[in-house]
Amino acid sequence: MKNIVYFFLVLMLVSCSNKEVLLPQVDRTIVATVEDHSPIYMFFETKEKDTLVDLNRKNSISSTNWIFNIDKRLPLKLVIPEVIKMQAKKSGSMHNNAESQNYFSYSDSIHKKLAFVPFTKVVYKLEKPKTGVTIYFSKNRILVDSVEFNKEKLEEYIENLTIEDLYKCNFCFDKNDSYGNFVKNYVFATTLEVKRTQTDTYIF
């Protein structure tokens, strides 16, 4: 019973304002713990037929690691502009610590615990890449230059690339996808990029 209750709490975070955030679920952990952090919340809200982001950054301290707790139901096209603004706010602060990191939080569905994936150096671009190979994650599909791949085929493709060719790969995500699906795909993409330091990520 304790395990069931604990996992329920991991799936759903409750902020100081008693609002709920339904976290994405992913079957692996990238980072298990984050010390000295500030929470950033993005809540799911609706007004008539519109979906809205309710951003709460009241407890953010620029010198700390920032953990973005974002509701998985939100569309990516609403989330990323807010993330970009918060990245700029932190980097532009006179109190910013160059060693601090930014993380997305999610629930590890296998180990039933809270987990995190870093995105500190990622530069989000709300456009299509103009050059290079496009690896496009759209809901349950992966397209490499418009050719459909499954995850195993993409892993093999990435493993066989030289570092030079890997630099030419652009990781892209569907702006109309949910944030929950984005995090699943982003965590998977993170595991593929071990040889790569390119930080541009495209949302279109």
Residue map of PLM features:
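C-terminal motif of bacterial Sec signal peptides marking the signal peptidase cleavage site
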Residues: M12-S15
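Sec-dependent signal peptide recognition
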Residues: K2-F7
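Long, low-hydrophobicity, acidic/polar, solvent-exposed interaction domains
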Residues: S17-F204
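Compositionally biased, low-structure terminal segments
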Residues: F8-L9, S138
